[in-house]
Amino acid sequence: MPPPKPVHSLRGPNKMLENFQCRSCAACSGELILDLGEQPLANNLLAPEDLAQPEPRFPLRLAVCTECWLLQITDLVPPVELFSNYIYFSSYSDAWTQHAAECAARYRDEFAPNYVIEIASNDGYLLRHFAEANTPHLGIEPAENIATVAREKGIKTRTDFFTEKLAQELAAEKPADLILANNVFAHAPDINDFVAGLKTLLAPEGRAILEFPHAVEMIAQDEFDTIYHEHVFYFTLTALEPVFARHALRVTRAERTPM
């Protein structure tokens, strides 16, 4: 299957970027797709007393690597700025909690996992279904305020960012036969470190299930509002399969989930 043709913005042909290096394949060939200028952080809500103060803004530009076709933003905001005191609780959404319950039931039936680890486990919205079934589990959640809520619900949770180094530490204790990562993979700026961590933490016959927005749908539906600093990457299978292959993993199934 030939690679997709470069996308062009409404302003005309895309601009080749200088000083670009793909975060996946390390190629130095990137085209600018969309430049939204400098924007404030999407979830950085201000207190009333701060409204008169200048709000921090960061460049927001979307580019595509012309070697591996991975869509990515060009300028990173440090994850500690974005996630250490996060304001989004997954349990606030009835649709999302229903989706989580259905997924948990399906995974228990299909895989019968003995140990489940969820990356970016938030407030325990998903792991609670495994806890209620007495399945050994661990949540990894970088936001202490949210991890505290999960622990109060009885969900075993570690406050940390997921990295290969952390995966090595956890795997030495017990590898996971099921790793879940919903709406976090696109947030991890070091994609190779993240995937290497999956490989390290998985048991020999283990599975990782990743859920994330699909770049094809984003483009087809003009969902430009999903482009913001938290979302470093915008994935297609074309761009993802080489990443997993690089770390001795492979895609065995891909599904679209209506939300």
Residue ranges of model-derived segments:
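Short, glycine-/aromatic-enriched active-site segment of Class I SAM-dependent methyltransferases
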Residues: 44, 210-233, 237-238
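Conserved class I S-adenosyl-L-methionine
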Residues: 112-122
